Amino acid sequence: MFNDLPELGEFPAAWKRKHLLGLEDLTREELLILLDKAQVFRDAFDQGRRKFSILPGHTSVTLFFENSTRTRTSFSLAAQRLGASCVAFAASTSSLSKGESIVDTAKNLEAMGCESMVVRHSTPGIPKLLSENVHCSIINAGDGAHEHPTQGLLDILTMRQRLGSLEGKTVGVVGDIAHSRVARSNVWGLKKLGANVIVCGPSTLVSPRWEEMGVEYSHSLDKILTRVDVLNMLRIQFERQYTSPFPSIREYSLLFGMDGDRLRRAKPDLLVIAPGPINRGVELTPEVADGPQSAILDQVSNGLAVRMAVLWLTDGARKLSS
């Protein structure tokens, strides 16, 4: 397979997945392939290289049934930078509004010649359903509270860039754990790399059941501050809840928000990340979000690199399997 980024090397023989549905099912080797190839793209960006002819003629369609700024734009740019074209599918003006099933919609898009579909949906399992009914690559861009694999990958890539090996490191994931697909993808990926994970938030949003995934849980941010090497600060997802899980935003921020005082009590080299969008003054104060220990904008840049790697790898596996 031709590419004008020789640093990518030969297509990895161990990568055989034409879909990316989540991080739970990946092997450690597959996870490392994704991270290593994403790092190649990120290094190229840092050297001023922005456009490649790696996927000429490839057409990717973004099927988003939930709002998105970063993820949808990032996937579109990723396709374009690989030399592919990207089409944004508008669900509200499509035949879905006339009663067509999502599977029939996907089959019709495939019949028009698309090679990959990037899918976001509020219902867990929709990307998997589509992967069982079409031949093109399906990439999960978030399905309900199940998984958001590319967000998990870019979070982990950012941690690796700052910390090196994650073996033995401790990562705190703080906030709305109950409704977070990001938390789940982080846990699955981090555990495969030997990291320790603590999920933290109000008792209404963090259940002891998380111990079944091999992680620790806590209802006190202050108690874990000096133990963690990384804090991943999640927003509260009010759109997935019918009632507020705590008395007030102010109380939540006082107990679980990261501010300058907590930052000074944490490890001096603590890394702070957040998947975005962030609510300034709730989970993070501007002092923390914009400070030197924050890697939020690095995450955004890494997201583009991750999605380029995912598109390249899944397309390669699709071609090899056909």
Task: Enumerate the predicted regions with their spans.
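A short helix->loop->beta-strand "cap" motif at the edges of active sites that frequently abuts
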Residues: 136, 194-196, 265-271
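Phosphate/diphosphate ligand-binding glycine-rich loop within oxidoreductases
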Residues: 49, 53-160, 280
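Positively charged, low-complexity intrinsically disordered leader regions
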Residues: 2-77
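Short, acidic/turn-prone active-site loops that include or flank metal/cofactor-
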Residues: 92-94, 142-147, 203, 222, ...
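Glycine-rich phosphate/diphosphate-binding loop of Rossmann-like nucleotide-binding domains
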Residues: 65-77, 161-234
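Adenosine-phosphate binding glycine-rich loop
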Residues: 269-322
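Rossmann-like adenosine-cofactor binding region
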Residues: 210-287
